């Protein structure tokens, strides 16, 4: 029991969120570099003479130099075992991104110093606040021209509604970037650029009152630093660890992921402030991560991960106890016992066998087609289900048809398989079949991913016609859709589970439906 507690206390599980090109994949790689998990960082854009980014593995990602799927990466650092849930950073991200946040205990928000808070960051932040998880901010690309740091922090507070407290403070930016001032230690870490960021950065640390500092920092920047230190101490938000852990205050660090600058200080601050895995709720009860009985839930399913492994894998977030390879568990939704013989951990498309894992870890389990998003597995006499993972509303819709009617079986199998993974949502007319399918996605790129995968994995080509719908609402079970008074451009459909939904072309249609149908309850997401 003591060993179990020690192992769980070492665990940290966090997701990295950002807008495209803020440097999220680069930051992820630098964490792995410092943890010794990789010897050389890749490059995000996959240049000819360099490796592809370690966390980007799907063929379409390598072609485009973007993260489309969510990766799960683990590394050890100074006695901690850290699980990074890497979310897609491209503008056209997917529902997978949201679900990954359901498996994390906290989030690292990466912001481009020249751009500030952007659209995708806002969307992902909403999910973090819904779960009240701690959010740590890394303001990246300080070695390029950046906006005023006060302005950036004010924008985070106003746009996202969370207070900020800088843990360190930048000295200049762009070509004049001289380093950061560590507020707690009252020290300056000098910026020494590393070409390409392929090795750990050299560091030189000076006390803030060291006369030598003036040799490295321009007079104007030196004077400004003294003013900033005084201003932050007098007028800045007071640091509160309690507020950080409650998701009400975001500690802010500045740096440059590409040149490795500020990565290690950020990691140290992060580990000092975070907690081991937190309890989860199941059937109204709190499940303690330290309990001996094992429990976990599926937050992601991925099929045909590459040509070498044509298979399907369910990713489980372990919530309590210890996993052991070959253990027998109870699958709550399937109402039966199963053996977990094939379990993996992943570094991009490299797989390694997992013999044991603990609360806070993520494991991939071979799935013969029995698991769905949100499923629970447990050991012990008491069976329970963790709270369902929300199905988030798609924002783009298209009608798809199979080009070759002789391949109907492959078409249906492929579309259903990809939908079960949660990459897309599929809808059909009430009482209709699978001849014509409406596909809903959170990001438009998922249409491209769907076409690519159907062609390469199922040998099926499709016709795709965009649809004008912008809003989707689930209808409370038991509602008779046929009797509803709706605008002429509203469409009645059902999802894969047969749940009734309405598709609207604009928010006026949503308001019309609510005004004309007393007591009609419309839901923005459904529970799995």
Where in this protein do the model-derived segments appear?
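Structural and coupling elements of P-loop NTPases
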Residues: 1-528
